[in-house]
Amino acid sequence: MYDETTLRAAPLTEAVEQSRRLVARTMRAWNMSAGEEPVTAIVAELVANAVTHAATPFELRLVRGEGHVRVEVRDRDHRLPVLRDLQPLSDGGRGMFLVDCYARSWGAEPAPDGGKLVWAEIDVAPRAAIAG
């Protein structure tokens, strides 16, 4: 079963909170609320990157797969994200590190129409599988 939900937004800081709320509603609707925390963390980082670095309108897409959720963020900036070495005293640069920690896999690729697609897949068990 594959379900999906999409949000298109302007590059405003409010879009990060709007995206978090979408994750919460969607994960509950999909009976996957046990995975809400890692999916929310990844969405917040990828959307914040789109808002801060791309500064273009973006599209967030959540896709439910068998036991996982795929997060996709498309924007119009061609620069791909980089996983940097974590610097303990740095004020930034932790976004993709967090994505790398939470996701079973992630990547970024140029979009055919320009810009890029950044994606992450997160293993998530349905609530019934965890409870029983």
Where would I find each of the regions flagged by the language model?
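Conserved beta-strand-loop-beta-strand hairpin that lines the nucleotide-binding pocket
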Residues: 1-6, 51-132
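STAS-typified acidic loop motif
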Residues: 6-20
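Pocket-edge positions in alpha/beta enzyme catalytic cores
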Residues: 8-11, 31, 91
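Short, functional N-terminal and low-complexity linear motifs
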Residues: 9, 25-28, 38, 64-69
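Conserved short strand/loop->alpha-helix "switch" segment adjacent to the catalytic nucleotide/phosphoryl-transfer site
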Residues: 17-44
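Short active-site loops of ABC-family nucleotide-binding domains
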Residues: 48
